[in-house]
């Protein structure tokens, strides 16, 4: 057996415990980097121009990964325009990167197909700055006004 005969399989228990300790020690910046405030501000901007903030469907959403839909512009077009502006976003989940189809997760959530086709995924990291979020907001809002 594995893990000195205590369990079957290939789980790396020492590795998992080490990762848990590292996350506890290093997770503090995530809690205090202002990401919640940044995303709340951006969500208000998205709603103000008629966009859809999919996290509104949840009681306890995350501030680090969000799906937003822009009125009048496909996700594919948004991804290309953000890329030209030097900003990385995606259409769909990380595990389906490269796919240009609406997310099955959004479909399962009951999101209408036309809204899903206009939805992009936006992620914040532990080191995302207020300036980067503001730049993203400016580009997104400019796109929404032109759509």
Q: Residue spans of the language-model regions?
A:
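Conserved C-terminal alpha-helix-loop-beta "cap" of PLP-dependent enzymes
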Residues: 66-121
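PLP-dependent enzyme catalytic core of the Aspartate aminotransferase-like
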Residues: 101-147
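Conserved PLP-dependent catalytic core of the aminotransferase class-I/II
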Residues: 27-81
């Amino acid at each position: 057996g594995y893990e000195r005969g205590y369990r079957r399989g290939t789980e790396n228990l020492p590795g998992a415990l080490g990762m848990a300790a590292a996350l506890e020690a290093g997770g503090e910046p995530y809690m205090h980097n202002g990401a919640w405030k940044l995303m709340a501000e951006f969500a208000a901007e998205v709603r103000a121009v008629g966009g859809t903030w999919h996290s509104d469907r949840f009681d306890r959403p995350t501030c680090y990964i969000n799906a937003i839909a822009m009125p009048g512009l496909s996700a594919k077009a948004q991804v290309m325009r953000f890329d030209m502006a030097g900003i990385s976003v995606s259409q769909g989940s990380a595990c389906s990167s490269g796919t240009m189809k609406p997310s099955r997760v959004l479909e399962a959530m009951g999101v209408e197909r036309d809204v899903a086709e206009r939805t992009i995924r936006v992620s914040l990291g532990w080191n995302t700055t207020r300036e980067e979020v503001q730049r993203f907001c400016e580009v997104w809002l400019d796109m929404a006004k032109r759509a």
